[in-house]
Amino acid sequence: MFPRSGLGLAVAAAVVAYLVLLLAQQLYMSNSSQCTIVITGESVSVVGCVYSEAFIELVKGLKPYYHPLG
């Protein structure tokens, strides 16, 4: 693919390093939990959150979105 020159080896090493870092980032992001709150017209969903007393106080008043038609 590349001739055996310093530039070709440097490009190949940079591509390999980029792919390794990209894989490490994907593994790190998939292991970390994400707190997601989805409010629709029908329900409120809380997924992946740490339920501390302060968090419960913040979200206990959430209600589905109401928008009258017409």
Swiss-Prot record:
Chief location: host cell
Membrane topology (Cytoplasmic): 26-70
A Pfam family the protein falls into: TGBp3
Domain of life of the source: Viruses
Disulfide bonds: none
Additional information: TGBp1, TGBp2 and TGBp3 seem to act together for cell-to-cell propagation. TGBp1 is the main movement protein that physically cross the plasmodesma with the viral genome. TGBp2 and TGBp3 would facilitate TGBp1 function.
InterPro entries for the chain: TGBp3
Ranges that cross the membrane: 5-25
Name this polypeptide is given: Movement protein TGBp3
GO BP, one annotated term: transport of virus in host, cell to cell
GO cellular component: host cell endoplasmic reticulum membrane; membrane
Subcellular location: Host endoplasmic reticulum membrane
Assigned protein family: Belongs to the Tymovirales TGBp3 protein family.
Role noted for this protein: Plays a role in viral cell-to-cell propagation, by facilitating genome transport to neighboring plant cells through plasmosdesmata. May induce the formation of granular vesicles derived from the Endoplasmic reticulum, which align on actin filaments.
Ranges of the Lumenal topological domain: 1-4
Keywords: Host endoplasmic reticulum, Host membrane, Membrane, Transmembrane, Transmembrane helix, Transport, Viral movement protein
